């Protein structure tokens, strides 16, 4: 009886091995969309941002801008522990593939917030800085670099609309305090250091209230030269 059971077990094991050998190897899906899924916990579905109040939108941003920011997190020019952990071992080629994926997405923007604690005077100051700048202090208008529609410029200047006020103010604050950097020439570092906290509160309050235009895509080029040299436009 024991011998019969042993033979049955051996035959069953042999059959299982034969079946495993005959079956094709399981293919594990590995697409850039699946790899980018790690980003959605913070940045929202397909990088379309969340209502969490801080994390920026990724989808539809200029590819060059996204690539530069990923490199900056990897190489220590921008500082965020989670982002650094995510990208610190990734190659330029991998980062460029991620940037191209998110840049190619064309998703609707969420509704623009309707409420603000900013005063009318603050909002007027923010609008003036956005479209006129402050020539006496050497501050160019935001629109001179980010486009008149504020939707960004290819290949490397981001749009300023559809972003949380907290995110905008934290980034301008980081330039003001020398905690954020870019490759030279670092145009935003030069501009950011000239801003006051009142300027930052005003311009970010105004920007956060502006609706995103129907055509939210970055423009191909500015109508004139940049007011300040900027590595963002180095192809």
Positions of predicted regions on the chain:
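Fold-core signature of tandem repeat domains
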Residues: 70-73, 90, 102, 172
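Extracellular/lumenal glycan-associated surfaces
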Residues: 60-63, 69, 158, 162-164, ...
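Tandem-repeat/low-complexity and Cys-motif detector
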Residues: 56-59, 88, 159-160, 194
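Positively charged n-region of N-terminal signal peptides that target proteins for export
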Residues: 1-5
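Bacterial N-terminal signal peptides
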Residues: 8-18
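The feature marks the first
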Residues: 26-76, 80
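Flexible coil segments in periplasmic/lumen-exposed cytochrome c-class electron-transfer proteins
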Residues: 23-36, 45-48, 81-88, 92-151, ...
């Amino acid at each position: 009886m024991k011998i019969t059971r042993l033979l049955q077990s051996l035959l069953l094991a042999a059959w299982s091995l034969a079946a495993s050998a005959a079956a094709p190897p399981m293919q594990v899906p590995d697409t850039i969309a699946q790899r980018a899924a790690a980003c959605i916990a913070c940045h929202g579905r397909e990088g379309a941002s969340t209502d969490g109040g801080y994390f920026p939108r990724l989808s539809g941003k200029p590819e060059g801008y996204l690539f530069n920011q990923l490199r900056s997190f990897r190489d220590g020019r921008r500082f965020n522990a989670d982002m650094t952990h995510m990208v610190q071992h990734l190659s330029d080629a991998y980062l460029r593939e991620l940037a191209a994926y998110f840049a190619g997405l064309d998703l609707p923007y969420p509704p623009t917030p309707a409420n603000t604690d900013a005063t009318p005077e603050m909002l007027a100051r923010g609008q003036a800085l956005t479209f006129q700048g402050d020539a006496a202090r050497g501050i160019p208008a935001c629109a001179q670099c980010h486009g008149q529609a504020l939707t960004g410029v290819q290949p490397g200047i981001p749009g300023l609309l559809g972003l949380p006020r907290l995110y905008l103010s934290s980034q301008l604050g980081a330039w003001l305090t020398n905690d954020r950097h870019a490759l030279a020439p670092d145009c935003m570092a030069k501009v950011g250091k000239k801003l006051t906290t009142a300027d930052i509160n005003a311009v970010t309050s105004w920007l956060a209230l502006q609706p995103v235009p129907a055509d939210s895509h970055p423009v191909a080029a500015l109508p004139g030269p940049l007011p300040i040299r900027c590595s963002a436009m180095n192809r």
